[in-house]
Amino acid sequence: MNKNFTLLVSFILTFFISETSTAQSWEVYNTQLQLQSRLIYDEIDLLSETVRIGKRGNELSLLSNDFKPAVSLVGTEIYQYLEPWILVKGPNGIGAFHEYGQQVLPLEYEKIQTYFNMLLASKGNEYWLFQRGFNKTTYLGELDEAKITNTGLIIIRKGDEYSMPLSTNPDKTFELLSDNDGEFVLAKEPSGFGLINREGDYVLDPIIETLQHTHGNFYYGFNQDQYLLIEGNDIQSNIRYNSFHKITFENDIMLEYIHGKLRRVMEDDGILLDDVGMTKVEKVGKDLYNVYFRDEKVGLLGKKGWLVQPMLEVEEIKNGSEGLFPASSNGAFGFVNSAGTWVIPAQYAETTLFSENFAAYRNTHNWGVINSSGEQVANASWEEIKPFQKGLAIAKANGKYFLLNTFGTTLNTEGFDDIYRTTDGFFMVERSGKSGLLDSEAKEVIPTEFEGLRRERKDFVIVQKDGLTGVINETGEIIIPVAYEKILVDWANDKIFTKNSFTPTVIQIIEEPSKKNKRGA
């Protein structure tokens, strides 16, 4: 028996032991679905047209153009991508890489603020500044606050003192340095307020008694008994308007009073309206004002003048569309035109704007539809009606969504849990947790049987079903089988990535016994 067993072993040259482990395989196709390559990564992230990230286990890499690991990103996950900076998170904190692959900050910080050529990092109350132009990191110290402005200035605060460490005079302190959505920093010194440009230089000397930002590069101030409207400029700021009469700036409304009476509605750089008899002004939208007069007229004022001429028997006028403006009288809403004439009498509790000559209205909790002549198109039986686009509106009743045409007729008899309009006239629909697609005439092109659905472009719809992903066209024809864990599309580089799990076979070879063994050994 032993002899037979020995002979059997001698006839076996190799013995295979298979061990299994799970890995992730990616196939890369062009947009004509021709296979280009195969990759082994757990995850691939496309951060931009040129920045691609690959992950294998705990190893995170910046990939080359041929999708090979080019730079190890050290950390375990991408924290944020703010071009050109890749913020990477690791066990000890956040660090930063330039998208070209250079590591500029170790993974040890709690927060990192980014600008296109610099980074501001912090741990607790300690701050560091990396400047790409000098390729160096500078310790700024223990601070109460530090920030990068939208023009790239560094402002720091310690106690009640502010300074700019990158300016030509980094040791100079200020009582206040405040940035805004404009291009200038509001500065305060003992001598007064001024404005500082992106170079850190004064373009308005600090001599103004009071100064506050309004919008953009404009400021409202007071100095030597004069009210000032100032516009920032990179070389020298300009006083656009000045007056010894009182100018107020409250609730984002600027008004001028002459001898104690309201006379002018102001904009950032001067007079918007000069009229007598005004009693009050209320802001009703961006650059939109209801102006009230002593003779009980009300008008709607816009950036370029009257949108609705002052008129009687109105309490409020809202922004409008298609030449009609919602307006209220005695607590009810109707529509007026730009001449200040009632077109649709005030009879509704609430209205929407007109869209394609149709608007929604309600008198109770339910909404209906009227046309621009005030004729009822749809009864007030809807919980919600969204604006008409290309002849269709999305409407909700009894918790379900329907498509409503301009005759007030629903195009789908069975409601959906939700309907989303796409940019090119299609409709994504959901029912019982499944998604589908309707065309511009509300006809079903993809049935509501998918767990997820994303229309990338014409005839290319990424779908998920039973936990797997694929691509179909708008007639339901399969483009890529619904058999993958994930699909990524990089249209700019003509690439489609499909992810799949597979189980590789690892073969362990046991060599045959050596023929040189002595007999009987």
Region annotations inferred by a language model:
Residues 1-25:
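Bacterial Sec-dependent N-terminal signal peptides
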Residues 24-521:
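Residue-level detector of conserved, function-critical positions
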